[in-house]
Amino acid sequence: GLLIVLPKKPKRSEILFHDKPKELQLWKRLSMPEELQRIRSMDEWFEKPAEFRNKFRSYVEKEFQRRRDGVWFYNNGVPTYITGRQYMFLQWSKIDIGYPSYLAFQREIFLHMAACEADPRCFGQLYTKCRRSGYTNICSAVLVDEASQVKEKLLGIQSKTGKDAQENIFMKKVVAIFRSYPFF
């Protein structure tokens, strides 16, 4: 077993879904304020009056904090940490079946990815996948997450052929996930 250090568990009141009964504690997407759902670009955001932007600034900043630091949520009474990348996957990455569900084995994939990224001795992640595990969607979401944070970063896609990478992964997965991201 690989030991991975998680962030310190916050106070109960700071863990998502702490106010729900144990049997109803499961991952559920958090709704965006209705006024923000209509905004499609940063240009539209900056055209809004300062009062409007100030009203929702804390929401946007909280989303960036969750993206950067990850988030804790209650899962059937168990405080569970997910990385920022998994948060972006679950909260904002619309895939071919809609938004993904939380799956515990995918949490392990995201935690291992984060450990690989944090360890300068690590050359990467080798994952022998089976079909229908969601790994292609996970990697597509990670690509969009990274590409949308770093200017002029070169990222790659690997598949059976270049054509398959372009048509089935980039066009059908990466572009769809990018389009589902919020304006911020």
What does each model-identified segment do?
Residues 1-184:
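Phosphate/NTP-binding elements of NTP-utilizing enzymes
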